[in-house]
Design a protein with these regions (language model features):
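Ribosome-associated RNA-binding proteins
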Residues: 1-182
Length: 182
């Protein structure tokens, strides 16, 4: 058995789960609703207010899908009940972010502004011109948008300036050593 796939997923009181045809799962909660379709090799059942994920056979592909399906379902349940957030910070002189409706303009030492639009279900907030918060119910979308923002100017390995996740430790490389006189 898969160590992750064996674990039960507890369903909070305010979350409703429907299992449709072809493993089409819809999860509804106070924050919104998510739907996803999973492979037929995996069985998904609801018993005693928890979700049980099992597999039909012990083929290699089924084993790999077992833990993945359980993790994706757990992310859906947590997303509709609590939601997900990723925070980023901009370090350095001249690095700023500006909110423009649902989009943000990033000034990251380029000749132009980087404009990043928030897709449906994702909200982007800018605080103090240097702190950015990405939030939503879909963990994959939140992480993807946060990664796009970070990739606009990743931290410089020598100075540490750039866009980084809040609390991210950037290991700095040593600079050039002074050349020894002969």
């Amino acid at each position: 058995m898969s160590r992750i796939g064996m674990k039960l997923i507890n369903i909070p009181e305010n979350v409703e789960i429907n299992i449709g045809k072809n493993n089409n799962i819809s999860v509804k909660g106070p924050k919104g609703d998510l739907t996803n379709t999973f492979r037929d090799e995996i069985n998904i059942n609801i018993e005693n207010n928890s979700i049980i994920v099992t597999r039909n056979n012990d083929e290699k592909e089924s084993k790999s899908l077992h833990g993945l399906t359980r993790s994706l379902l757990n992310n859906m349940v947590i997303g509709v009940s609590k939601g997900y957030t990723k925070s980023l910070e901009m370090v350095g002189v001249g690095y700023r972010a500006e909110q423009k409706g649902s989009a943000i303009n990033l000034s990251v030492m380029k000749s132009h502004l980087d404009v990043i639009e928030a897709p449906d279900g994702i909200t982007i907030k800018v605080e103090d011109n240097t702190k950015i918060t990405v939030s939503g119910i879909d963990k994959q979308k939140v992480g993807h948008i946060a990664a796009i923002i970070r990739s606009s100017r990743p931290p410089n390995p020598y100075t540490g300036k750039g866009v980084r996740y809040l609390g991210e430790q950037v290991s700095l490389k040593p600079g050039k050593s002074a050349r020894a006189e002969i």
